[in-house]
Amino acid sequence: KGERTWLDFMAPVERFVYRICGIDPMQEMNWKQFLKALLTVNLFWFFWGMLLLVCQGWLPLNPDGNPGQSPDLAFNTCISFMVNCNLQHYSGESGLSYFTQLFVIMLFQFVTAACGMAAMAGVMKALAAKTTKTIGNFWVFLTKSVTRILMPLSLAVGILLIINGTPMSFDGRQTLTTLEGGEQVISQGPAAAIVPIKQLGTNGGGYFGTNSAHPLENPNAFTNILECWSILILPMAMVWAFGFYIRRRRLAAWIFGVMLFAYTAGVIFSVWQETGGSRQIEQMGISQKLGSMEGKEIRIGSAASAMWGMTTTVTSNGSVNSMHDSQTPLSGMMQMLNMQINC
């Protein structure tokens, strides 16, 4: 609404962006101009991503020598991350270089989240003003979504992840000797820069192939809570922002209440199912005292895995800390229901 906030210290950065991009922040747009700007920025970044993914074998920050993606795989990757789907037909350790992880995947995760927030800001302004003749400036909404929300939160979450063991380096793979005497190759890289926006932007595309089930992407119980919180915070906040902006906070409270009730009920049901274990597996003589642990990480456990499964599907995030197809049938049903409701 143009009111002063404590995040106004980012204004010089925003003015710099407007200046170098030739943007007039005072120019109002109608819905056609707004839509044209949204489609234009996404089209530009699509071709940017295609070029870098296909050519990544010749680009810097590739200590492991990962080759470029085939054109069809690059097309799939770009479309997937451009529409905030984050379907991955590759494994990040071998399918991408550090350069493309940062300047394609991480960039797209910021851009798509910011585009969604900018689009919602335009809708909210139109509803508040009861007109589509002027719905704000898309470029201003896009820029402020990044500088005032996504970047500060990502920085804070990233620092906490680094403290807890998530790597932030540009070194290549390390070969280690295990306790059994065998060798294991450990991939690393700038994971702590990418995981925060993966969660905060409800993106979901993992840095590593196994996503947040990987111990370097989600090292312990604290990071599991942090990443789960990161999934929820902005979708929840946007409901209240909607009510604030159109001056109907009671409506926002009702919407939030319905969403929270459905989410809480789903979490309770799924946790009950997963911690109860599988009767079929128990009949095979395998203890189910820890719950149904098939496809789950010991450091996370069945209850936290169940809660994550519900959290990631109610928000269309898609990240995982366990294998959802290994959860009990009724938990899987709840996750499918969440995805269908989101559609």
Q: Which residue stretches match the model-derived regions?
A:
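Membrane-proximal intracellular helices of multi-pass ion channels
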Residues: K1-C343
